[in-house]
Amino acid sequence: MRLREKKTRVLLFRVYTIRVEQLPLSSFFEGKNSKFWNSSYILFELFVRVCCCRLGASSCSNDEQKMKYVVVSGGVVSGLGKGVTASSVGVMLSAADYRVTHIKIDPYINVDAGTMSPFEHGETYVLDDGGESDLDLGNYERFCDINLTRDHNITTGKVYQSVIEREREGKYLGKTVQVIPHVTDEIQDWIERVAHIPVDGKEGPPDVCIVELGGTVGDIESMPFIEALRQFQFRVGPENFCLVHVSLVPVVGSVGEQKTKPTQHSIQALRSAGLAPTMLACRSSSALDKAVMEKLALFCHVSPNNILNLIDVSNIWHVPLIMVEQKAHLAILGHLQMKPRPLKLEAWKHRAEKWDSVHVPCSIAVVGKYTGLGDSYLSVTKALMHSSIACDRKLKILWIEAEDLEEESKQANEDKYDEAWAKLKRADGVLVPGGFGGRGVEGKMCAAKYARENEIPYLGICLGMQVAVIEFARNVCGHADAHSTEMDPTTEHPAVIFMPEGSKTHMGGTMRLGARETIFQTKECVSWRLYGKKDAVAERHRHRYEVNPEMVDELEQKGLHFVGKDETGTRMEICELANHPFFVACQYHPEFKSRPGRPSPMFMGLLLAASGQLESYVSDEAVELRISMGNMMRSPIKSIKAAGLYVGGTD
């Protein structure tokens, strides 16, 4: 009886699904008397509706909004700005009051970006759930003010790992597991599943999922994903699938002729794989000629109204505004059959214009190990930008390779050594970001020592905190051989030690990762005021080593206070130096949670101290004003000035 009931439920659900998808019932009941079915149609439809709803069929609501997908691909060369383009699409749709989520597809075989060198693929961006992802997820989070998960970054490694696990579990029922259909199905299922995860703190799924396909069309690594997307457009329906292709229109020769052939070939490769672009976003150094636009429309089979010209801009906050000027939002919404709504971009426009208009400079020396590639510290750069705008200052970053500050560098290349120290000495503030390994550590300690002794505002992040502690232990506490066991396992004064829960054999995903709580130990510290007098804050971590708890008492007696600790009270999270304008370091990475409208408090502290405005910002009255105004405070310094609480800095 139970088997018969189960079969009946499956039959009713399949019949109803066919009806909902507007397929003829005859496609299911072939050979049946059509006259009988037509005469009983109304009664039968009502019967199926009631049964399906009672059985909990998800399709019983015809009003359910289907997920919309915008896919962003790229051609000709890498590094065209697909991530910024995808993020800008998200900004436009969010400004139209649609809920947006993002997915990034990376065709590399690595499971995630956690074991990659910054020189190889830029920074590793850490998410709240501990996912180590591509830096583009940072762009998505910053632009759209959302919080993604590790599953929002799809890699070839993750897909094949999942498929192989299913095969080992016998989930494929003895079939030969192949790229098509098993890998492509896994990709489609992954996209569809993750697209429905809410990322904006609200309940229910988002309205639109923006999927960026990493790499370049034509790369062999991308082929399974392109095939999966080709199938996916039919799975979700053409009215729910929009493809934006980003391509390069180079200028060749002294006459400045704009060439369309590379884009034509890119579109040809895309179409041969079964995908046709809805919109073409052309990157160029200057505005495209009208004749060039017409030629692209003709040869690429794209409507002239759907060709965007994304020129080089002074800051990336202009990109969504440029796309809106060219009515890109209307083209996307129209194709997806979504209702156009007024855009709320006033704050975004204000921010883009303010970055270009502020003129009072503030220079920050960033002493790093991977300064040869700007993307290695992308989130640090963005966090500095967010804070400089809020502080009404024109940011100037002085990049310093840590090794160039070391004495050994002076012997090898004295010019580099002198140049590095000249940069450090003219900086208004010093920032030492995270890193791994022993290379450049002594140079970072030189920067920390210089900032400490000369009362220069200093912010240390992760390794930047550890080198500050080691330097203090050496030069203030008198332990000349103090070091980290990462660099010197035999040191008699280990100021920094390996965390007991870490793994020394498996590198991927074995660090202390993701959002962790930091609890303030005292209210007599600048960090507590910067965070708005909160008792605890949640910030993202990525580290294997920590400050040695056995040395904390001695360090604090000498003036280095650990004002923030983890929930157990045994792991040091924030330290501050007494009797210093601003010497703060944290074990976590505050740059990962900085947003254009909500700068990281730690970065705000550095910029404010470097520009002589910290006292005004952290006074009791100013902190209470900031707490009361909350997100309404677009420009904190101007608001503090308007309230008559400003006491420092000059314009």
Where are these regions (language model features)?
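C-terminal and late-domain segments of enzyme folds
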Residues: 522-651
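Flexible phosphate-sensing "switch/lid" loops adjacent to ATP/NTP-binding sites
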Residues: 46, 51-429, 435-437, 444-450, ...
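Short, hydrophobic alpha-helical segments
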Residues: 195, 300, 332-340, 476-480, ...
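Cysteine-nucleophile active-site neighborhood
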Residues: 87-91, 423-526, 596, 602-614, ...
